[in-house]
Swiss-Prot record:
InterPro entries: CRA_dom (IPR013144), CTLH/CRA (IPR024964), CTLH_C (IPR006595), Fyv10_fam (IPR045098), LisH (IPR006594), ZF_RING_GID (IPR044063)
Subunit structure: Identified in the CTLH complex that contains GID4, RANBP9 and/or RANBP10, MKLN1, MAEA, RMND5A (or alternatively its paralog RMND5B), GID8, ARMC8, WDR26 and YPEL5. Within this complex, MAEA, RMND5A (or alternatively its paralog RMND5B), GID8, WDR26, and RANBP9 and/or RANBP10 form the catalytic core, while GID4, MKLN1, ARMC8 and YPEL5 have ancillary roles. Interacts with F-actin.
The protein, known as: E3 ubiquitin-protein transferase MAEA
GO BP terms, alphabetized: cell division; erythrocyte maturation; proteasome-mediated ubiquitin-dependent protein catabolic process
Region (Extracellular and involved in cell to cell contact): 1-124
Purpose: Core component of the CTLH E3 ubiquitin-protein ligase complex that selectively accepts ubiquitin from UBE2H and mediates ubiquitination and subsequent proteasomal degradation of the transcription factor HBP1. MAEA and RMND5A are both required for catalytic activity of the CTLH E3 ubiquitin-protein ligase complex. MAEA is required for normal cell proliferation. The CTLH E3 ubiquitin-protein ligase complex is not required for the degradation of enzymes involved in gluconeogenesis, such as FBP1.
Pfam families per UniProt: CTLH
CTLH domain sequence ranges: 159-216
Keyword Phosphoprotein in annotation: yes
Lineage of producing organism: Eukaryota, Metazoa, Chordata, Craniata, Vertebrata
Subcellular location: Cytoplasm; Nucleus, Nucleoplasm; Nucleus matrix; Cell membrane
Residues annotated with Phosphothreonine modification: T28
Protein's gene: MAEA
Catalysed reactions, as listed in the record: S-ubiquitinyl-[E2 ubiquitin-conjugating enzyme]-L-cysteine + [acceptor protein]-L-lysine = [E2 ubiquitin-conjugating enzyme]-L-cysteine + N(6)-ubiquitinyl-[acceptor protein]-L-lysine
C-alpha cells in the first residue's frame, strides 16, 4: 500500500514538474496545424478561382492559346497547393513525433530496471540544467550540454533561441523582430490580453521624437493609436505630450519616457509574455526543485552562529547553499528524529540517545565505539567522562 502511494505521489510530481516538457511541443504542433489550415484554405481558394475562370471561358468559344494559358495557371496553382500541403504536413509530422518522443521518455521513469531508472534520472537532471542555462542566457553552454547528453529533442532549445533573437534585437533598439513575433502569435497574444505590441508602437513613437522627426511621429500615432482605449489611451495622451518638448527635456514624465532603460523593460515584458504564451513559470524547474529540496531539509541548526551544530553531510549547512536557502521556509517535521553527531545514524530504541554530563547527546552505539578504558571523550568539547556517567534520554 505504501509503495502504491509513493508511486502515485511520484506520478503527480512528474505531472507538475514535466508539464512544460509536453506543453511547449504541443503548442508548437497546434500552431503549425492552424497555420497549415490557413495556408491550404488560401491556396485552395486560389485554385477554385482559376478553375472557375477556366470553366467560364470554356462556356464560350475561346481560342486555343487562351485555354492553354488558363490551364497553365491551373497547373501552377495546383503545384503551389501541393507544395504548401507537403511542407505543412511535414512540419506537423515533426511536431507530432517530438511530442511522441517526449511522452516515451517520461514513461521511462517507471522502469523496473535500476540501471534504466538511473539513466533516466541523469537525463532528467541534464534537461533541468539545460533549461536553467537557457533562461540565464548561457545558450552555447546549454546547446553543448544538450548535444553531449543526447537530449536535444527533449528540451525547448528552439523556443529559447527564437527568444534570444528577439531580445538581442531589442537590445539593439530595434522593434521589427519583436513585432514579427507578435504577428506570428497574434491570436494567442490577443487572448492573453498582451500589451507588448502596443508598448513597441509607443517606443517607436518615442524614438521618432528622440530623432526630432515629429511629423513622422504624428503619422505613426494616427496609424497605430487610433483604436486605443482605456489605460492605453492615457499612455497615448502622455506620449503625445512629448511633441511639445525637446528630446533632452528634464520634465517628468517625458524625461522617463525618453529614458533608454525602457528598452530593458520591453525585454522583460517580452520574456514574461513568451513564458505565458508557452505556459512556463517565471522560474526554471531546476530552481523550483532545488528550493523545494533545500526547504525540506532546512532546520534552525543550519543557521546557528557558532557553527557547532552544522553537519558536513547537510547541503543547507554547506557554504554554497546556506545563503541560498536563507529566505526559504523551514522543513515541516511532525515527528522529531534525532541523529547522532558522531556516526550520523538515527537514534532510536536500537541506538538510544545518551547524554553526557556536559549536556551533549550521542547515540549509544557511537559512545561504545569511542570508549577506551571505560572512558569517552566528547568530540565537541574534548572533555573526558566515565561511560557510566552517560544517561539515557527519553523523548516525550
Amino acid at each position: 500500500m505504501a509503495v502504491q502511494e509513493s508511486a502515485v505521489q511520484l506520478s503527480m510530481t512528474l505531472k507538475v514538474q514535466e508539464y512544460p516538457t509536453l506543453k511547449v511541443p504541443y503548442e508548437t504542433l497546434n500552431k503549425r496545424f492552424r497555420a497549415a489550415q490557413k495556408n491550404i484554405d488560401r491556396e485552395t481558394s486560389h485554385v477554385t478561382m482559376v478553375v472557375a475562370e477556366l470553366e467560364k471561358t470554356l462556356s464560350g468559344c475561346p481560342a486555343v492559346d487562351s485555354v492553354v494559358s488558363l490551364l497553365d495557371g491551373v497547373v501552377e496553382k495546383l503545384s503551389v497547393l501541393k507544395r504548401k500541403a507537403v511542407e505543412s504536413i511535414q512540419a506537423e509530422d515533426e511536431s507530432a513525433k517530438l511530442c511522441k518522443r517526449r511522452i516515451e521518455h517520461l514513461k521511462e521513469h517507471s522502469s523496473d530496471q535500476p540501471a534504466a531508472a538511473s539513466v533516466w534520472k541523469r537525463k532528467r537532471m541534464d534537461r533541468m540544467m539545460v533549461e536553467h542555462l537557457l533562461r540565464c542566457g548561457y545558450y552555447n553552454t546549454a546547446v553543448k550540454l544538450a548535444r553531449q547528453s543526447g537530449i536535444e529533442d527533449l528540451v525547448n532549445i528552439e523556443m529559447f533561441l527564437t527568444a534570444k533573437e528577439v531580445e538581442e534585437s531589442l537590445e539593439r533598439r530595434e522593434t521589427a523582430t519583436c513585432l514579427a513575433w507578435c504577428h506570428d502569435n497574434k491570436s494567442r497574444l490577443r487572448k492573453m490580453k498582451s500589451c507588448l505590441e502596443f508598448s513597441l508602437r509607443i517606443q517607436e513613437f518615442i524614438e521618432l521624437i528622440r530623432q526630432n522627426k515629429r511629423l513622422d511621429a504624428v503619422r505613426h500615432a494616427r496609424k497605430h493609436f487610433s483604436q486605443a482605449e482605456g489605460s492605453q489611451l492615457d499612455e497615448v495622451r502622455q506620449a503625445m505630450g512629448m511633441l511639445a518638448f525637446p528630446p533632452d527635456t528634464h520634465i517628468s514624465p517625458y524625461k522617463d519616457l525618453l529614458d533608454p532603460a525602457r528598452w530593458r523593460m520591453l525585454i522583460q515584458q517580452f520574456r514574461y509574455d513568451n513564458y505565458r504564451l508557452h505556459q512556463l513559470g517565471n522560474n526554471s524547474v531546476f530552481t523550483l526543485t532545488l528550493q523545494a529540496g533545500l526547504s525540506a531539509i532546512k532546520t534552525p541548526q543550519c543557521y546557528k552562529e557558532d557553527g557547532s551544530s552544522k553537519s558536513p553531510d547537510c547541503p543547507v549547512c554547506s557554504r554554497s547553499l546556506n545563503k541560498l536557502a536563507q529566505p526559504l521556509p523551514m522543513a515541516h517535521c511532525a515527528n522529531s528524529r534525532l541523529v547522532c553527531k558522531i556516526s550520523g545514524d538515527v537514534m532510536n530504541e536500537n541506538n538510544p540517545p545518551m547524554m553526557l554530563p556536559n549536556g551533549y547527546v550521542y547515540g549509544y552505539n557511537s559512545l561504545l565505539s569511542i570508549r577506551q578504558d571505560d572512558k569517552v571523550v566528547c568530540p565537541r568539547t574534548k572533555e573526558v567522562f566515565h561511560f557510566s556517567q552517560a544517561e539515557k534520554v527519553y523523548i516525550m
